[in-house]
């Protein structure tokens, strides 16, 4: 959901947008894609109709994806900016697709720390590894920037004024419905 405001902005600015759907959450993706305004190309990298919620399903998705990444090259991606977000298997698959095809990997909300690689596995591994692969890392505070420096990332760290969650809240029309001084987080 956090990439949709970026997608809509790119479309509004007449950029060609290609959305790669990795297949981890096809049911959720179907509803989110409806929030995209304008023309874009939609590529289903792995076909599926049900959201994957088991480790066996995730392992199968990873194996199928790795074979496709290794044997199916996309020359049109070379030197293009390719945006990923999150700490799921889809994020890692997206990063592998981009790097295999020599695209420029952009990671939104980079540098979020974690309590230990094994305490929050595989999300912590994905967050760290995708940051190491990224050409551009978007952060919104100094703590995240410091974390990326500690991780010795090679990509360029870019600081933005606010977290992309604000754009996401606006997308689902919640920003104007919340009380400014009252927040509940679960």
Identify the residue ranges that each predicted region occupies.
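A conserved, positively charged/aromatic
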Residues: 113-135
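An aromatic- and histidine-rich active-site surface loop
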Residues: 83-101
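Conserved nucleotide-sugar phosphate-binding/catalytic loop shared by glycosyltransferases and other
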Residues: 12-65, 148
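A nucleotide-sugar donor-handling region in carbohydrate enzymes
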Residues: 22-27, 133-186
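A short, glycine/small-residue-rich beta-strand->loop->alpha-helix junction that serves as a flexible
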Residues: 1-5
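Active-site proximal beta-strand in glycosyltransferases
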Residues: 97-113
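Structural motif
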Residues: 79-81
